[in-house]
Amino acid sequence: MLMLVFRLGDNRYAIATPAIVTVLPRVNLQSLPGSSPAVAGVFRYQGQVVPVLDLNQLLRGAASSALLSTRIVLVNQGAPDEPTRLLGLLAEQATETLESHQVEEIAERVDFCQSPYLSEMLVSQQDIIQQLQIYSLLSQQAYDELIAQAATVS
């Protein structure tokens, strides 16, 4: 399995590519007043309103930098038996991919009850990589609320 790797500060994270629809350059986002600081805003992709989460804000508590390597990773957050639910993930330094054979899963399990979107930890030749469980980033209800809010500010 192929994984997209990105860096936030000194830490590396990975998203499994089967969930990735495409990777886009950073675009201007329409803000949603009153939403969580982790919600960077919304944009239109092929006619559909897409909410965007700022992964740096979510994981480190600070907004993503406007780097040339900052990307919007467009993922399908819907489960395989659900309709497509596009979600944008603002990620810094999203410039690398790894094959699963290039990493080892750390055997010890860490309880991420406060952060259910953090999954297995992997070890590469360079360092430790934390996998993201994209299906746990945003509930269906929260997603629907963001889409409804976007409709009122459009």
Predicted regions and their residues:
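An acidic, low-aromatic, low-complexity terminal/linker signal
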Residues: 1-154
